[in-house]
């Protein structure tokens, strides 16, 4: 069974626009949950930067949701791990609860129809080709 991705109202920096998952219908979304204490998250950021750069023009949107309770920890992480994609802060865990995941990081690939199509628990560099193939398969599908 394929589920629709939950629509959420995230906590964003004061100068950011609200983020509505409905705004991304017709695009493929890589929604990644991460935390400052997560070592595999550090490894995933360069890959997400590269995939956002190469696949963004083809319709991929990368959104990384931070689940730290302390925003300063997330900001310190981002000073050392540059992000060329959207960052959302979820210190209360409201967004994370809607997606009900256990591992860190966890990525959800959401199809153009707004349904969760793939779930990747953890980040493993040796699986990057599979992550890429999953994204390409969704980008190749026609929008509803």
Can you annotate each of these PLM segments?
Residues 10-29, 55:
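A short beta-strand-turn-helix
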Residues 1-10:
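Bacterial N-terminal signal peptides
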Residues 27-29, 33-37, 103:
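Short pre-active-site segment immediately N-terminal to redox-active cysteine/selenocysteine motifs
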Residues 30-32, 64, 108-109:
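Hydrophobic beta-strand core positions in alpha/beta domains
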Residues 109-144:
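Thiol-/selenol-based redox modules, centered on thioredoxin-like
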Residues 27-29, 59-61, 86:
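Structural signature of beta-strand start/N-cap positions in the alpha/beta core
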Residues 75-113:
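Short, internal strand/loop/helix patches
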Residues 33-50:
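Conserved redox-active cysteine motifs that mediate thiol-disulfide chemistry
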